[in-house]
From Swiss-Prot:
Protein name according to UniProt: Probable tRNA pseudouridine synthase D
Reported function: Could be responsible for synthesis of pseudouridine from uracil-13 in transfer RNAs.
Family matches, as SUPFAM superfamilies: Pseudouridine synthase
PROSITE patterns: TRUD, UPF0024
Protein family according to the UniProt entry: Belongs to the pseudouridine synthase TruD family.
Lineage of source species: Archaea, Methanobacteriati, Methanobacteriota, Thermococci, Thermococcales
Active site as annotated: D83
Gene that this polypeptide is encoded by: truD
Length: 422
């Protein structure tokens, strides 16, 4: 199953016909620029660099930089992961001894697809320490660009009346060709480490390098043969296979992966469940831009959702809350399930509990007692995307879109609602 098949399970918010087209035909068609808070620079503890990268996953780029300058990659911090199939600008912090020596080493660094610019000193960066991202996206392959422009206007007009774009987690959370991350996450959550390993190592599409090796491993379970056949670029798969050969434990094999990588599986499953809840709310005709009794809403400050400041709507507070929603001071949320999740009541609460029942999961499972490093407390996430500075125009290449999104919000989900390509 590819991401188009996967996302066909989730409802569009607008009914207007999409414009089709293709994003990411070239890396320069998808440009991302990270925005971090100024408070990061209120320290001289670490070196702060702006990385420009192309055809590199964030974690792989950080490991390569650390290896070249001779430090542990754990001393390199970052605020957000960025797409490989794009040109991305993001910040990293380097916190270690002999910072001046490291600075000299970086000045002479030459890595294809990566450039680094020193921007100052600051605090160690951690995942989530960003405000958001600016995007520039070129949509190519349009049959009739002028008609596409008119359709875009119509879609945007409809979405404005409905409060924004549906805030689905994007394809990067699940995998674009092997859409399995959420399935691996569910198996890990249930403590089925062997099943999760077979899914991660053995699932194949039929048209990717390494598929024959995956297919053979799924059939035979032969670890020695897999180590001979799995290509070197499948470094995480190979790391797991080596660890399993050493320990005969798939749990320990998952634990050998870098923590940000292995947590992707649980995050992906949480994201799938959120998307399912959001889609069902749309399907049932419930507003995303008007609170219902029992809904949980989050505060909004300077146009940005404060996801950890939430309150439950009652019949008594309903009118007051919806006045705040209209003023842009609050937003209706959906569930990011975890062991400390606060579920909604009313119609949304019914949806949330139905999904937990359908999936056969208990919130306490997110404590991940067998592998506590994967524990997830959960939280809430706004149901709508309200892009800032949204602009678009026609060009020789196609349609060019520019906008800013808060952290954790996906540009691909904005484009999906306009393209409707699945």
């Amino acid at each position: 199953m590819d991401y188009k098949q996967f996302f066909s399970n989730f409802r569009y918010l607008s009914s207007s016909k999409g414009i089709g087209g293709k994003i990411k035909s070239k890396p320069e068609d998808f440009i991302v620029r990270e925005v971090i808070p100024r408070s990061v620079f209120r320290s001289d503890q670490c070196l702060i660099y702006l990385i420009k990268k192309q055809n590199w996953e964030t974690m792989a780029a950080i490991k390569e930089i650390a290896k070249r300058i001779g430090i542990d990659y754990k001393n390199v911090g970052f605020a957000g992961t960025k797409d490989r199939h794009a040109i991305t600008y993001q910040y990293i912090s380097i916190c270690s001894e002999n910072l001046e020596s490291i600075k000299e080493s970086i000045a002479s660094l030459n890595i294809e697809g990566i450039s680094l610019k020193f921007v100052g000193r600051g605090k160690p960066l951690k995942l989530g320490m960003l405000i958001g991202n600016h995007f520039q996206i070129i949509l190519r392959g349009l049959e009739d660009p002028e008609r596409a422009l008119e359709r875009t206007k119509k879609i945007l007009k409809e979405l404005k009346l409905k409060g924004g774009f549906p805030n689905y987690f994007g394809s990067q959370r699940f995998g674009e060709r092997r859409v399995i991350n959420h399935e691996v996450g569910k198996l890990l959550l249930k403590g089925d480490f062997e099943g999760a390993a077979l899914k991660f190592l053995g699932e194949y599409t039929g048209d990717m390098t390494g598929d024959e090796a995956r297919k053979d491993f799924l059939k035979t379970g032969d670890v020695e043969k897999a180590l001979e056949e799995f290509p070197n670029f499948l470094r995480y798969e190979r790391a797991m296979l080596y660890k399993y050969r050493e320990t005969r434990s798939w749990k320990k094999a998952f634990a050998v992966l870098p923590r940000p990588i292995v947590r992707i599986f649980i995050h992906s499953y949480q994201s799938y469940l959120f998307n399912k809840a959001l889609s069902r709310r749309i399907e049932e005709g419930l507003s995303l831009n008007e609170a219902l009794s029992g809904d949980i809403v989050c505060q909004v400050k300077k146009g940005l959702p404060i996801r950890n400041k939430t309150f439950k709507v009652t019949e008594r507070s309903l009118k007051f809350v919806n006045e705040r929603v209209k003023r842009g001071e609050a937003m209706v949320t959906g569930p990011v399930f975890g062991f400390a999740s606060r579920l909604a009541d009313g119609p949304m609460g019914k949806i949330e509990r139905e999904i937990l029942d359908e999936e056969g999961i208990d919130l306490n499972g997110f404590k991940m007692k067998q592998l506590p490093i994967l524990a997830e407390a959960g939280g809430r996430r706004e149901l709508l995307i309200k892009p800032r500075g949204f602009k678009y125009k026609s060009s020789e290449e196609g349609l060019i879109f520019r906008f800013f999104l808060p952290k954790g919000v996906y540009a691909t989900s904005v484009m999906r609602e306009i393209m409707k390509d699945h």
